[in-house]
From Swiss-Prot:
UniProt cross-references to PANTHER family, sorted A to Z: GLUTAMYL-TRNA(GLN) AMIDOTRANSFERASE SUBUNIT A (PTHR11895:SF151), TRANSAMIDASE (PTHR11895)
Gene3D superfamilies tied to this protein: Amidase signature (AS) domain
Pfam families: Amidase
Record family assignment: Belongs to the amidase family. GatA subfamily.
Keyword Lyase: no
Protein species of origin: Streptomyces coelicolor (strain ATCC BAA-471 / A3(2) / M145)
Protein name: Glutamyl-tRNA(Gln) amidotransferase subunit A
Catalysis performed (reactions): L-glutamyl-tRNA(Gln) + L-glutamine + ATP + H2O = L-glutaminyl-tRNA(Gln) + L-glutamate + ADP + phosphate + H(+)
Assembly description: Heterotrimer of A, B and C subunits.
Domain of life per record: Bacteria
Length: 497
């Protein structure tokens, strides 16, 4: 394995800025890694080799001219295939958008380019971000670099797998019910769901508009903070974008501390269904926080037990509306366009061929929940539960600065193990969904390996909305303490591919 691909994003940016490395050298090293291992991992759906090298050459030329470089100049990045990229395919893991090349960049894509980040390509994902394992991709599953027979999480398993396989030091994901944090947890990486509205959704293909949020993925807390600062900020193109200063996440990541902080532990985030090794590593993390000077506060949030049920009414309802735009007439795949079918028949045939089973399941569920006579009983009730969850978070944050929990109830499960059991699959997001419903910020970072299977366990940190900096302050302190304890970052234990 090349020494270059072991570097953090912060180290790469510093070495390129000083001239110790060129952006082309760094990009070529990561492209070589992708070529060497991605046949096994399948993290990428599209590798833009020529585009990445062109971006890298532009960074090197900019430096030679003495021009100011972007904050992550020359650092390679893997982009989840849910963000539009001008001239590069965007499939959202679906056959219905196979071959679609967007005519414009998402705001996140634009901001990455403005920061001189080198986009290596687009990563695999569950179709339309609906899944917890990246098995629902129309283009095949992604393997977990720790054990290729295991899932890398979902929906953004391609992004987390690319990080764990050292194919890129940075990645972008999206989080609707845990799709950044859950993959980070099972691959031993860092993933952050910013405050809802903190990162623009313009050009991000919609699943559930009131829940979707883009965010940074990395192998270290500082790298995630550097990326967070690049992509965050108000965007007039997104009506849900928050018009407020971006929290000082990089400063927080450089000054990690929990001394004197009140840290909440929620009673509902443990019990039946939680793997013993996950609970053990979480309990050790709580003891670590105590040793670092934090005060632990027990919290009771009974409405959190209803979060999963509420989510699986709200998200499918919004998805059934959002996916109505894929009609086979305006863009993407088109089936039955031979002059013998009506427009309505073309739409029906296109959706039947283009959407996978999980997407169809959620569209039907959402349509039913919104239907006349059932709206109040299902969607309306779910929104009331959502309000209760928000209120319980608000009361909790009157007592504590942050809340911690396991990120997922179990470590990575085997590919195919839960394919025929949707409920078992949905339970993977048990700890992450409440945060999405409330719009708060959350992070997952590695807290060790489960003794039973030697697979990564994630610690989730939750902060109030627009207090994203607290995630990084706590996360950096915990990360430093664990690295000192282990003698090296957890990710260095990942088996060689």
């Amino acid at each position: 394995m090349s020494d270059i691909i072991k570097l953090t994003a912060a180290e790469i940016a510093a070495k390129i800025a000083s001239g110790e490395l060129t952006a082309v050298q760094v990009t070529e090293a990561h492209l070589a890694r992708i070529e060497a291992v991605d046949e096994k991992v399948h993290a990428f759906l599209h590798v833009d080799r020529e585009g990445a090298l062109a971006q890298a050459r532009a960074v090197d030329e900019k430096r030679e001219r003495g021009e100011k470089l972007g904050p992550l100049a020359g650092v390679p990045l893997a982009l989840k295939d849910i963000f539009t990229t001008e001239g590069i395919p965007t499939t959202v893991g679906s056959k219905i958008l196979e071959g679609w090349i967007p005519p414009y960049d998402a705001t996140v894509t634009k901001r990455l380019k403005a920061a001189d980040v080198v986009i290596l390509g687009k990563t695999n994902m569950d179709e339309f971000a609906m899944g917890s394992s990246t098995e629902n991709s129309a283009y095949g599953p992604t393997g977990n670099p720790w054990d290729l027979t295991k899932i890398p999480g979902g929906s953004g398993g391609g992004s987390s797998a690319a990080l764990a396989a050292f194919q890129a030091p940075l990645a972008i994901g999206t989080d609707t019910g845990g799709s950044i944090r859950q993959p980070a947890s099972v691959t031993g990486t860092v993933g952050v769901k910013p405050t809802y509205g903190g990162v623009s959704r313009y050009g991000m293909v919609a699943f559930s508009s009131s829940l979707d949020q883009g965010g940074p993925c990395a192998r270290t807390v500082l790298d995630a903070a550097l990326l967070h600062e690049v992509i965050a900020g108000h965007d007039p193109m997104d009506s849900t974008s928050i018009d407020a200063p971006v929290p000082a996440v990089v400063e927080a990541a450089r000054n990690g501390s929990v001394d004197g902080m009140r840290v909440g532990v929620v009673k509902q985030f443990r019990g039946e269904g939680y793997q013993a090794g996950v609970v053990q590593r979480f309990d050790e993390s709580v003891e670590l926080l105590k040793s670092l000077g934090a005060e632990i506060v027990e919290l009771d949030c009974p409405s959190f037990d209803l979060a999963l049920s509420a989510y699986y009414l709200i998200a499918p309802s919004e998805c059934s509306s959002n996916l109505a735009r894929f009609d086979g007439l305006r863009y993407g795949a088109r089936v039955g366009d031979d002059g013998t079918h009506s427009a309505e028949e073309v739409t029906s045939l296109t959706r039947e061929a283009g959407f996978g089973p999980e997407v169809k399941r959620r569209i039907m569920l959402g349509t039913y929940a919104l239907s006349s006579g059932y709206y109040d009983a299902y969607y309306g009730s779910a929104q009331k539960v959502r309000t209760l969850i928000k209120q319980e978070f608000e009361r909790a944050f009157e007592q504590v600065d942050v809340i911690v929990s396991p990120t997922t109830p179990t470590t990575a499960f085997a590919i195919g193990e839960r394919a025929d059991d949707p409920m078992a699959m949905y339970l993977a997001d048990l700890c992450t969904i409440p945060t999405n419903l409330a719009g708060n910020a959350a992070m997952s970072l590695p807290c060790g390996l489960a003794p039973e299977d030697n697979l990564p366990v994630g610690l989730q940190i939750i902060a109030p909305a627009m207090k994203d900096d607290r995630l990084y302050k706590v996360g950096a302190a915990v990360e430093a303490a664990f690295v000192e304890k282990w003698g090296h970052p957890l990710i260095e234990e990942a088996p060689s591919l």
